[in-house]
Amino acid sequence: MNTFVVVFLLLTAILCHAEHALDETARGCNRLNKKCNSDGDCCRYGERCISTGVNYYCRPDFGP
């Protein structure tokens, strides 16, 4: 019984990690605080590509 639980949790963790990786490559978007070139090609909905002085990063867009 204990072995079954360990194997089940291991498989669940592997599947969740694989699904997360596929989701990011399918979107072509970077996660929050990653470098970007423009709003359209890397930021998720509700984020903007904002300059931090040297580089640009996707940050939440709270309006104008």
UniProtKB/Swiss-Prot annotation:
Coiled coil: none annotated. Residues 19-27 form a propeptide. Its main location: secreted. GO terms for molecular function: calcium channel regulator activity; potassium channel regulator activity; toxin activity. Residues 1-18 form the signal peptide. Disulfide bonds join 29-43, 36-49, 42-58. GO terms for cellular component: extracellular region. It is found in: Secreted. Keywords: Calcium channel impairing toxin, Disulfide bond, Ion channel impairing toxin, Knottin, Potassium channel impairing toxin, Ryanodine-sensitive calcium-release channel impairing toxin, Secreted, Signal, Toxin. Expressed by the venom gland. It comes from the Eukaryota. May increase intracellular calcium release through the activation of nuclear inositol 1,4,5-trisphosphate receptors (ITPR) of cardiomyocytes, thereby causing an increase in the contraction frequency of these cells. The presence of a 'disulfide through disulfide knot' structurally defines this protein as a knottin. Belongs to the scorpion calcin-like family. This is Toxin BmCa-1. It comes from Olivierus martensii.
